[in-house]
Amino acid sequence: RNRKLEKVTSNAGNMGFEKALDDEMAKNIYVQNQYNSSHEFYDNNFLRIMLQKSDDEALKPIHYMFIHLDMMDRYYSRQEIFHFMRKIRSRLHQNEIMGEVKKGFFVILLYRLDEQQAKDRADEIYRYCIRKSENAYRSIRYDLIDVGVKKPVDVYDAYTRKQEEV
């Protein structure tokens, strides 16, 4: 975790240079470099730290795609769940980051997409999840949340708190 945090904070010094580039690819690379999204899953604590740093205008708009796996009455090991989620992660774009909220509950952060693009992308990811699940889970559902003008970490905390109450 400390190594991840050091990477995020060390990349913060490069933000001025990368934000100055007007090219769309450079902006997506900025998101990927900022959070090193292609390498691993993030846990809930690191996601919160990352979201606290997501107030940057270069990252907006931000949408959250929360994915819930209904595991029925069967026990799935973390390895089985992560094997499935790695398939999903391999399909993510440079401006998308995936993390685990808790077992069977994941989030994909969709940076720099307008509302319609985010809906289309979430539907595409959802269809891919259904295809790759091979009927292992009774249901896979998702919620798409637009952060809007609120603080990204506040929206994340409110949603996850609400899910714990259900």
What is each residue range found by the language model?
Residues 1-55, 92:
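Signal-transducing coiled-coil linker helices
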Residues 2-11, 26, 38, 139-153, ...:
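Flexible, glycine/charge-rich interdomain/linker segments that couple
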Residues 28-36, 66-80, 92:
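Active-site loop/short helix in cyclic nucleotide turnover domains
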Residues 46-76:
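Active-site-proximal structural segments of metal-dependent nucleotidyl cyclase/transferase enzymes
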Residues 51, 84-89, 119-134:
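Alpha-helical scaffold within the catalytic cores of cyclic-nucleotide enzymes
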Residues 55-57, 85-115, 135:
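Conserved helix-loop-beta segment at the catalytic/binding core of cyclic-nucleotide signaling proteins
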Residues 63, 100-111, 128, 134-163:
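A short glycine-enriched loop-to-beta-strand structural element that forms part of the catalytic core
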Residues 76-83, 116-120, 147-166:
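Catalytic cores and conserved motifs of cyclic dinucleotide signaling enzymes
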